[in-house]
């Protein structure tokens, strides 16, 4: 059973002018530096406008010991998400938080991928803090964000 662990307090919300700025919002996911206390590498889920990060949330993807595993063709191996473009599903209430379905827009045998609250990591995007998952779900709904790019 995956049990959420607390992490540092979420970042302060962006200033109102940033939220009202012109430009399309997009979600990107990238490998960061450092590790959670669980040993999972830190990744960043970033809300971007015109290529600049507006806000970001710490996340995990894949379990710590499977970071170098095949990311595209081995379902169930707990590797991080493969790089590429994903279609985002509508956020759904799930296990006291949210599930946001991820559908790869490229050939892969991976399935049942999503964004949800968990830590240690799984083969999904795991946000350790339910408040962060709720914030991401809110942005997706309000801004009509329909895709995510996994950068690395």
Residue ranges and their predicted role:
Residues 126, 149-150:
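Structural signal for conserved beta-strand scaffold positions within catalytic alpha/beta enzyme cores
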Residues 121-129, 133:
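Active-site nucleophilic cysteine motif
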Residues 2-119, 134-145, 151-152:
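Cell wall/extracellular polymer interaction/catalysis modules
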């Amino acid at each position: 059973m995956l049990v959420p662990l607390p992490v540092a307090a979420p970042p302060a919300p962006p200033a109102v002018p940033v939220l009202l700025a012109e430009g399309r919002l997009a979600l990107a996911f990238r490998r960061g530096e450092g590790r959670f206390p669980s040993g999972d590498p830190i990744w960043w889920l970033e809300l971007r406008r015109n290529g600049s990060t507006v806000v970001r949330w710490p996340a995990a993807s894949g379990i710590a010991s499977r970071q170098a595993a095949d990311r595209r063709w081995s379902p169930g191996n707990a590797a991080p998400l493969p790089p590429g473009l994903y279609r985002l599903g509508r956020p759904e209430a799930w296990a006291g938080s949210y599930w946001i379905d991820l559908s790869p827009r490229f050939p892969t045998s991976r399935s049942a991928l999503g964004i949800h609250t968990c830590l240690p990591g799984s083969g999904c995007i795991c946000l350790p803090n339910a408040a962060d998952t709720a914030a991401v779900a809110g942005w997706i709904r309000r801004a009509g964000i329909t895709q995510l790019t996994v950068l690395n």
